[in-house]
Amino acid sequence: MSTEPNSPFVDDPLSAVDARILGSLVEKQATTPETYPLTLNALVLACNQKTSRDPVMNLTPGQVGQSLRQLEGRGLVRLVMGSRADRWEHTLGKGLELVAPQVALLGLLFLRGPQTLSELLTRSNRLHDFDDVEQIRHHLERLAGRGLAVHLERRAGQREERYMHLLGSQADLEAAVEAMGSDPERAAPAALSADAEARIAELETRLAALEERLARLEGGA
C-alpha cells in the first residue's frame, strides 16, 4: 500500500453498512433517476442486490435505517419528505467537496471493494462517462491526495494495480486487502459482462419500485 495522507475518517470511519448505503445511492441516482431519491424499502433492496456487489449483503430495514440516521448526522445523506413516502439521497458531493467523477468512483469502491483501473472504467459506464483509464487515475489520485482513497501496489499473481477507498475502519480495509490477496484475479461470480450486470440491476430496481407501488395500493384499499 502506497503512503497517502491520513483519511479524515480515521477517527470516525464508515461501517460496511454505511459504505453499502452510500454506494447504492450513488448508483441508483445515475442508473434509475426516475425512482431516485430512494425510499427505505427500495434502498434496502439496492443494498442487497446480488449483482454489482462484493460482498453480497442481507441487510434489514432496521440496519439500514439506523445507518441512515448516522449518515444524516454526518452530512452525507439527506431525508427528502414526501406525500406518500420519505426518501433518501446522498450528499457526498457537498459533504466531501467532490466533483461528479470522484463521487462515481467512490460509489464503485464502496460497492465492490478494491478494483483495477480497467475494472473501474468498465463498471462506471452508467455512472459517469470517463474517457479512459488515465482520466480515472487522475481522479483517484485527487481522492488519494485527500486521504479518501489509496493506491495498492500489485501483489504476487496480479496483473494490475488496484485502488480502494479509505473511509472504512482499519479492520474492514485490512479484510478487503486480505480477500484480494487470497484470490488476486477474482472476477464477478458469474463472469457477467458490465452491460449484463447493469441490465439485471436495473430490473431489480424496477421490480422494487413496482412492489412498493403495489404495497401502497393495497394499503389504500
Swiss-Prot record:
Q: State the InterPro entries in the record.
A: DUF480, WH-like_DNA-bd_sf, WH_DNA-bd_sf
User: Gene3D superfamilies, per this entry?
Assistant: Winged helix-like DNA-binding domain superfamily/Winged helix DNA-binding domain
Q: Per its UniProt record, what Pfam families does this chain match?
A: DUF480
Instruction: Please give the start and end residues of each transmembrane region.
Output: none
User: What family name appears in the similarity comment?
Assistant: Belongs to the UPF0502 family.
> What is the protein name given in its UniProt record?
UPF0502 protein PA14_19450
Organism this protein belongs to: Pseudomonas aeruginosa (strain UCBPP-PA14)
